[in-house]
Amino acid sequence: MTKSLSDLLQTNDFTRRHIGPSEAEQAEMLGVLGVSSLDELTQTTLPAAIQFDGELHTGPGMTEAQALAELKAVAQKNKVFRSYIGMGYAGTDVPPVILRNMLENPGWYTAYTPYQAEISQGRLEMLLNFQQTVQDMTGMPVSNASLLDEATAAAEAMTLAKRQSKNKGSNVFFVADNVHPQTMDVVKTRAEYFGFEVQTGSADAIPEGAFGALVQYPGTHGEVLNLAPIAEKAHTQGAALIVATDLLACALLTPPGEQGADIVVGSAQRFGVPMGFGGPHAAFLACQKGFERSMPGRVIGVSKDVRGNTALRMAMQTREQHIRREKATSNICTAQALLANMAAAYAVWHGPEGIKTIAERVHRLTGILAKALQDAGIKANETFFDTLTFEGQDDLGARAEAKGINFRLDGGKVGISLDETVTPQDLADIIEVVTGKGVDVQKLDAEAVDGIPAPLKRQSDFLTHPVFNTHHSEHGMLRYLKQLENKDYSLTHGMIPLGSCTMKLNATTEMIPVTWPEFGGLHPFAPESQTQGYAEMLAELERWLADITGYDAVSMQPNSGAQGEYAGLLVIRKYHEARGEAHRNICLIPASAHGTNPASAAMMGMQVVVVKTDEQGNIDFDDLKAQAEAHSDHLAALMITYPSTHGVYEENVRDVCDLIHQHGGQVYLDGANMNAMVGVAKPGLIGGDVSHLNLHKTFAIPHGGGGPGMGPIGVKAHLAPFLPNHAVAPTSDSHTGAVSAAPYGSASILPISYLYIKLLGAAGLRQSTQVALLNANYIAKRLSGAFPVLYSGKGGRVAHECILDIRPLKQESGVSEEDIAKRLMDYGFHAPTMSFPVPGTLMIEPTESEPKAELDRFVDAMLNIRREIQDVQDGTISAADSPLKHAPHTLKDLMDSEWTRAYSRETGAFPSAAQKAWKYWPAVNRVDNVYGDRNFVCSCPPIEDYIGA
């Protein structure tokens, strides 16, 4: 049959690239399940009451070339001016060796959070480098492996200060008036529902009895304060001192840790990460020893493996939300690992001399500007690192705009912040705009003002570890990055079947715009006239997401799923308050909920009441009804995930939502599992009032080894007036405070989700969901004879993921879910999710992007492992001698001169034919978690330890 021109244009080409199984393979898999089509599978899996049979209004799919061309036209509506606005955002030069080999490299950006340490040693090492960088620059002994942004890091520091302060009975927190306004905004939002009173004033005016104080160093307007007397006063009064600082400034300034700071926060953005209209960037939090077990966020620690070799891991996880739930130190889950790795690589690339040279250049240029201002009779701050502030002339903004320049214009004041991208010509342009006179920058150099007082000049060394003093040639750096990448398992190696994580394809086309200067080069507080491309893209993306979810309004501000939960609950609280029902503070949460749910509710000052689940994994409706009735007058919300965290579509979800509404509550429908709903159901149409969406799951933003992510929220119309706003760049008339430092969160990664939707179109989005269901049910069906599938819904089907019950086998054989997870590494796989939501289980989510061959390879590996367990059950080999207990096997194991194990080397490392064609090698043997927590070290070990490993 002759193809038409329409056929030849291949407008659906991307859909078949994104979806793993071919049409023929889909037909074969559908046959295994006993259905004839994807539509039949959908209709027989989803409850009839929730099915959406219409068509999404996202348009038809298009080719990759078409989509890129259209988005490029939108991006070019942005005007990339030279922005000297500052406020925690600075221009930076991304070293090309890092840009190409890390940021644009799927070996780095498609990996998951390094819970499985044995196959994550590369990024764990770079994250440890990040921690060391932060510790060295700030002068602090302990730091974490990134937070979402500087403002939320400050808010996290506030609650850490509360836990550590000597003033246990105090609810007063002090914020100096030299703190960035967006930080002030986020801190006030966070403080409200903790019951904290935020007081402000000059940095040295810490009130008696405050539990903590936050100051900026250098200040938002550029001044450099002596922190030592402020720290002394804070400590005398029993308060913890938090300092928000600039890593580059700390190359020249006496670091906060040497002046008495208890906690130091900030952003590592100017260490080689583009501004990106607000993000993503890696924030940091460092603290004194003794604070670490209350510290928020992931911390990388040094441990050892079973052979005694140095091995890295995520340390002290018992303080995190996935274990402590509502008692966790924070609800943080996704952080900014990829951006932290970039910042660490920047420090490795430049080394101490390079970093100091950049800092000296920025300071010298600022000193020349200070001299030019003096000569023009303009009075600016006398102490500074990179920022000068002075009274402005009425027409200065217009003159700057005509020159393609942005200054900070704030209440009659003008702020100018310089950065590493500024050239002498740029500085000459700035001076001409401000003074109206041309100058010779080189001649002014000899008269440059020194803005750092002698007592505040840094004397201590930094970045002394060999890793920061070795890789300064491009070949050296290239090979170091590659060596680390080769230690890690990512989607470039195979399927990452983590349940509740949706490790789908991050298509190359979707990633391309992330590094376009039109998106990366914009300051988040640039004038609206310069950001029209972003405005157009954001408006369309918000409209699409509202349509997909069945909600009426969307906020793009939350920059993680956990922050989306927090924002959604904030909206609910504001709604109740506006109705005169501020007393509503009870949040009902099923026992099976993700740990971020109760942690987020606790952060919103809500009392968590746990609802039972039944033997099928569903919400116990009788218990829910009893709890709703018992707490009716104070019921604020129910938080549920749909499909449930047990991987099934609960039949009575509409009844559940109706019950909550009858008692005056709102329904927070967690969108973590939205990959099972797009195009086939809408949370806003089944009773949800608000949901967050994990764009780094459902909408193809890569996980980055632990971030970035985005967690926008959709709400019904009655909640729309209460969406988060922003003090610096208002997005609405809402009086709700900000939850992120930037008004649109991590805006520069939103083009990924935009292209994902545009490329697939309405039909492709629906088909992707259907194939996600197909792949999960295919795996469940093939494995059900070997491992019990714990929960299933209508017709014995699962949703987009399935849970295998390992507990009976563990009881009979002594082989645990952890043993299976580690053994899968020998077969060339990342482990499924372990012991969530049920201890002793494995939760598998293959996503729609995995081809049938990969699904079969995984099933075959699991069936082989089941046979290995059977050998233990039959007494052929003891559990202790089994390859399952010794997994994973490394190349060093095979190189041992003596092999005394009860199985062959080949059985250990090459358990199936697939490994003989291609083999992924774990970098270390099983890591000793207990040793790592008992001997906590979160800085870089001696280089000899790496060599020994």
Swiss-Prot record:
Cross-referenced HAMAP family: GcvP
UniProt protein name: Glycine dehydrogenase (decarboxylating)
Cofactor section: pyridoxal 5'-phosphate
EC number in record: 1.4.4.2
Swiss-Prot/TrEMBL keywords: Oxidoreductase, Pyridoxal phosphate
Assembly and binders: The glycine cleavage system is composed of four proteins: P, T, L and H.
Cell inner membrane as UniProt keyword: no
Family indicated by similarity: Belongs to the GcvP family.
Entry GO CC: cytosol; glycine cleavage complex
GO molecular function: glycine binding; glycine dehydrogenase (decarboxylating) activity; pyridoxal phosphate binding
InterPro entries, per database record: GcvP, GDC-P_C, GDC-P_N, GDC_P, PyrdxlP-dep_Trfase, PyrdxlP-dep_Trfase_major, PyrdxlP-dep_Trfase_small
Modified residues (N6-(pyridoxal phosphate)lysine): K697
A biological process term (GO) from this entry: glycine decarboxylation via glycine cleavage system
Catalytic activity line of the entry: N(6)-[(R)-lipoyl]-L-lysyl-[glycine-cleavage complex H protein] + glycine + H(+) = N(6)-[(R)-S(8)-aminomethyldihydrolipoyl]-L-lysyl-[glycine-cleavage complex H protein] + CO2
Annotated source species: Deinococcus radiodurans (strain ATCC 13939 / DSM 20539 / JCM 16871 / CCUG 27074 / LMG 4051 / NBRC 15346 / NCIMB 9279 / VKM B-1422 / R1)
Function: The glycine cleavage system catalyzes the degradation of glycine. The P protein binds the alpha-amino group of glycine through its pyridoxal phosphate cofactor; CO(2) is released and the remaining methylamine moiety is then transferred to the lipoamide cofactor of the H protein.
Organism domain of life: Bacteria
